[in-house]
Amino acid sequence: CYAGLYKRREGGLLMASKIVLSGYYGFNNLGDEAVLYSILRTLRTSKPDLKITVLSGDPAQTKKLYNVEAVNRWKLQEVFKALRQCDLLISGGGSLLQDVTSSTSLVYYLGVVWLAKLLKKKVIYYAQGIGPITSWVGQKLVPLVSNKVDVITVRDQESKNLLQKLEVKIPAIYVKADPVLGLYNREIERKSGQDLL
């Protein structure tokens, strides 16, 4: 499981008390909100006293829905403050590192990671779906930034292959299930258990 992986890493979840989550959150996208819910559930199950801050397009809504701290992802001063005060940045899940829909979004997510590393914070890619990455800029920036990340998990072998093709080689890359799939599987297990009663 994800929590077990991070606990085994020095300076990872076991050591972190303040975590920042970066993803496509606060835009009323059902899939991405399910990803956020699943990540929060995993983190809180592993360590209930975590202080979690989400970078969100709608901080007020995110605070209300998930009982977390949230800051406006577009306000650099707020993002900087959240990263400066955290122990760990989790980037993901979802398909954040791609430039098909927009190269701007790729630069944004990599920029958040880059800023966290400048502040000497631990960074995890969480169940990322990588690619397509077609632009010259994207193909240069992804390995430049990703080789500074502490732990990388991707949701499929294709994503791992692409990172390796782009020469991301410093952190180990783990293939793990999409967190939403894990949430779905737990729900099936719960219902199956009820049916047996």
Task: Show which residues each predicted segment covers.
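Active-site anion-handling motifs in enzyme catalytic cores
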Residues: 1-3, 9-197
